[in-house]
Amino acid sequence: MSNDEGETFATEQTTQQVFQKLGSNMENRVCFDCGNKNPTWTSVPFGVMLCIQCSAVHRNMGVHITFVKSSTLDKWTINNLRRFKLGGNHKARDFFLKNNGKQLLNTANVDAKTKYTSPVAKKYKIHLDKKVQKDMELYPSELVLNGQDSSDSPLDTDSDASRSTSKENSVDDFFSNWQKPSSNSSSKLNVNTGSLAPKNNTTGSTPKTTVTKTRSSILTASRKKPVLNSQDKKKHSILSSSRKPTRLTAKKVDKSQAEDLFDQFKKEAQQEKEDEFTNSSSSTKIRQNDYDSQFMNNSKGNNNNSIDDINTQPDEFNDFLNDTSNSFDTTRKEQQDTLTPKFAKLGFGMTMNDANDLAKQQKESQKIAQGPRYTGRIAERYGTQKAISSDQLFGRGSFDEAANREAHDKLKTFDNATSISSSSYFGEDKEVDEFGNPINSSGSGAGNFDGRNSNNGFIDFNASADDELQMLRDVVEQGAEKLGSYLRDYLRK
């Protein structure tokens, strides 16, 4: 499909392949200007990926500097896709770094117009135009995606023909420089190693006593290192291939040879033990001789009596020397025993502890963690009361259990009474007149006489009527309260 100017549009599948291949590089997954992730807009002249905010900045610069397109929404021509086939954020960044444009790659405090009108940006634009022109000459009417396009460096301006010739030359040089190892190398090695045999010591000096250890023929043959002359060494140039690394090969050993090797190893171990024992015994003898010489030198300055005493007790002196040597050997053995690692023989779990103490500590910790348990005694005892004090709860302070019990007993006698007086509560005796009515503190009968009519001697009937009305009023109020509470409970249901 083509437009009026003759430009060929690419299919959506080709466009997706180009940008998917471009997104395989991590540097192409961020904006080239600000560093935001997942950019979907592009600067076509420079072949870089941009975010939507930076695309607005590029759109304001002008088409003579740059123009933007969406990688997912717009249609793309083949020539525009060539710039992203051969470009990308990673190649533009490499070009800027290698051409003194590092300060322009900073994502902050860099003007976009200054960045894209700089000499480095202009050089990169010209460089990308040349690469696009070469690709158009190779593939004029189609877009071919090769694996080499993403690996080409931005500074590589040589032609593809020169690259192919250089590759062919490098291959020819590699195979021309390759040389097979000569078959007579083993014979040369044998001759040279034979010439390096040690010469016999012709001097008159006596060699020091050393412990000679026999080695197996197989081990010595495998450990020999070949020695090459200067003529046999290969000269490697810079253009030639790298040296072939030497490989270590293992030789097969027969069963009989393996048994001989094990026997030889045992003999060598026994020989080493014997040598250590002889060295230790020789050291003890040398020390004993030193003690003898020192003792003889000290004995010369003493008087004759001391000499006679020493001569009479030679056995004790020899025993002393033997004891010192034995003590030295024992101390050495003790040091060896302390240095050798040993496992302590313990019980289950290989830990030293006291199970009883641990169990007690665990029980105490559980008790502390649990705290006091709720038994319900407090609710049973004080559930009907409206309030209690801490002294009453714990039985301390001004609280008296006997007085409290007596008060409860007195209150039980007034369970059915509507009202009580202090005299009836405390059990005080009331004065009664001749009619059996209680007498007030004023001296007149409260039920029969009033203070106003005490002089006339008549009975006041109004007082009794008022009392009856008051009682009737109280009964009505109580009934109304009960009826109201009943209706309230009914409505709540």
Swiss-Prot record:
The modification Phosphoserine is found at S170, S306, S389, S398. It is found in: Golgi apparatus. The keyword Metal-binding applies. InterPro entries: ARFGAP/RecO (IPR037278), ArfGAP_dom (IPR001164), ArfGAP_dom_sf (IPR038508). It comes from the Eukaryota. Residues 145-255, 268-338 are annotated as: Disordered. A zinc finger (C4-type) spans 31-54. Keywords: Golgi apparatus, GTPase activation, Metal-binding, Phosphoprotein, Protein transport, Transport, Zinc, Zinc-finger. GO terms for molecular function: GTPase activator activity; zinc ion binding. Coiled coil: none annotated. Residues 278-296 have a biased composition (Polar residues). GO terms for biological process: COPI coating of Golgi vesicle; endoplasmic reticulum to Golgi vesicle-mediated transport; protein transport; retrograde vesicle-mediated transport, Golgi to endoplasmic reticulum. Residues 16-137 form the Arf-GAP domain. One of its GO terms (cellular component) is COPI vesicle coat. PANTHER family: ADP-RIBOSYLATION FACTOR GTPASE ACTIVATING PROTEIN 3, ISOFORM H, ADP-RIBOSYLATION FACTOR GTPASE ACTIVATING PROTEIN 3, ISOFORM H-RELATED. GTPase-activating protein for the ADP ribosylation factor (ARF) family. Involved in retrograde vesicular transport from the Golgi to the endoplasmic reticulum. Present with 1510 molecules/cell in log phase SD medium. This is ADP-ribosylation factor GTPase-activating protein GLO3.
